Design a protein with these regions (language model features):
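C-terminal active-site subregion of NodB/CE4 polysaccharide deacetylases
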Residues: 1-62, 68-70, 135-234
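Histidine-centered catalytic micro-motifs
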Residues: 7-9, 122-130
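Acidic (Asp/Glu)-rich catalytic clusters
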Residues: 35, 76-82, 106-125, 153-156, ...
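Generic enzyme active-site microenvironment
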Residues: 62-63, 124
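Active-site glycine- and acidic-residue-rich loops that bind
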Residues: 67, 98-107, 170-174
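Short, glycine/acidic-enriched loop or turn micro-motifs at the edges of active sites
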Residues: 67-68, 129
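A short, conserved beta-to-alpha structural element at the edge of catalytic cores
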Residues: 82-104
Length: 234
């Protein structure tokens, strides 16, 4: 089975980055590394059609929360280095700010989402209300998922059937986990992404527990290179 690292980013800034915020300078260094070393990027919907990955270095780039900074700072770099990415968007917050976090960072508007080039950016779900699934009932999770689907349909958006769990949280107790996965499947979701910080094998053994590497703003390029090769560093 082939190895497939999936990167997770959030806010991008022109200043120094830390934690979930990365500087545009460091982001460019990382994207340049991927391009210079021949990494092939995929949209998640492309993986749904594949039984195996092509030979060589493969990777998936994801951004959570739909920040305007991703449009302003990350998108030009994706274009420059000919990379693809998936933007996971909490739909109730379009045109607002990240009230679950700092309340100061702007989320893209509906019009900005529609302006994204689908050849470069794939849109995926990040729930509707950005709440932890571990703190919601099964009925609330289903209602949230259905609201996402309704919103996308009502507004003429094109989303892939992929979902990144807010905070990386999902029900792990066996009975609840089975209901959770069934709920997502019934509503057409085919991939669910957590965090985990491990390198995936492809095809995915657990398509609703796909792991991502949390790229911290303070990572050096060396640490980034180690993370995409090994995942968790002990």
């Amino acid at each position: 089975m082939a190895k497939l690292p999936i990167l997770m980013y959030h806010h991008v800034t022109v200043e120094d980055g830390k934690g979930l915020t990365i500087s545009v300078e460091n982001l460019e260094k990382q994207f340049n590394h991927l391009a210079e070393n021949g990494y092939k990027t995929f949209h998640l919907k492309e993986l749904l059609k594949l039984k195996e990955l092509p030979k060589g270095k493969n990777i998936v780039i994801t951004f959570d929360d739909g920040y305007v900074s991703q449009l302003d700072l990350a998108l030009p770099l994706l274009k420059k280095y000919k990379l693809k990415a998936t933007f996971f968007v909490p739909l109730d917050f379009l045109g607002k700010t990240d009230t679950w976090n700092t309340s100061s960072l702007e989320i893209m508007t509906l019009e900005q989402l529609k302006s994204l080039d689908s050849k470069i950016v794939e849109l995926g779900f990040h729930s509707f209300y950005h709440k932890k699934y571990t703190e919601l009932s099964n009925a609330e999770i289903e209602a949230d998922t259905r609201r996402c689907l309704e919103f996308v349909s009502e507004n003429g958006l094109r989303f892939s059937p992929v979902l990144a769990y807010p905070y990386g949280k999902f029900p792990k107790e066996k009975a609840r986990n089975e209901i959770f996965k069934k709920t997502l499947k019934i509503n057409g979701i085919e991939y669910g992404l957590r965090i985990g910080n491990r390198i995936n094998s492809f095809p995915f053994k657990k398509p609703f527990e796909i792991e991502r590497i949390d790229v911290k703003g303070e990572f050096s390029l060396l640490k980034f290179r180690q993370k995409i090769r090994f995942g968790k560093l002990f």
